[in-house]
Amino acid sequence: MQNPQNLIWIDLEMTGLDPENDVIIEMATIVTDSDLNTLAEGPVIAIHHSDEVLARMDEWNTRTHGNSGLTQRVRESRVSMAEAEAETIAFLEQWVPKGKSPICGNSICQDRRFLYTHMKALESYFHYRNLDVSTLKELAARWAPDVRDSFKKGSTHLALDDIRESIAELQHYRKHFIKF
């Protein structure tokens, strides 16, 4: 059910860090309520790209996405970037009105740069604000390192796992760092 207070969490896996030269190879979304309770998990989509595109990945991306099985899923996928974008928007329309939720995640500005370059309709679905968990991580590192260090991430570098970790990390900071 649509609610303007719901939050949209997104994570992208890419072939690199430059949106002008690299591409999105996996995306996932989760919608939570304002108290960070998961309401729905959206589609987890491996986006097809040619072997030529995948061959341009640097060593870190080649190793990481190869070890996780993502590279093979991308090769086997028949979903285009446009189809992935449309499927994700269709999911989000069920839960959050356009322009209401900030884009939520970890280091989310990087994901937003890729969306702006490769999926403009999806990027414009979000409010212009960002809810970036990495901001709290940086503040905790400076003001309460024990709080930051007490949260351990698994870092599978798969989109859905990364979103779940981002939500859990924000829940951790809410409980142990933000005083209200």
Curated annotation (Swiss-Prot):
One GO cellular component term noted in the UniProt record for this chain: cytoplasm
SMART domains xref list: EXOIII
Top-level taxon in the UniProt lineage: Bacteria
SUPFAM superfamilies membership: Ribonuclease H-like
Span of the signal peptide: none
Active site: Y128
Cystines in this chain: none
GO BP terms in the entry: DNA metabolic process
EC top class, as a word: hydrolase
Main subcellular location: cytoplasm
Keywords, comma-separated and alphabetical: Cytoplasm, Exonuclease, Hydrolase, Nuclease
HAMAP family assigned: Oligoribonuclease
Function: 3'-to-5' exoribonuclease specific for small oligoribonucleotides.
Record family assignment: Belongs to the oligoribonuclease family.
Protein name: Oligoribonuclease
Native species: Pseudomonas fluorescens (strain Pf0-1)
Organism phylogeny: Bacteria, Pseudomonadati, Pseudomonadota, Gammaproteobacteria, Pseudomonadales
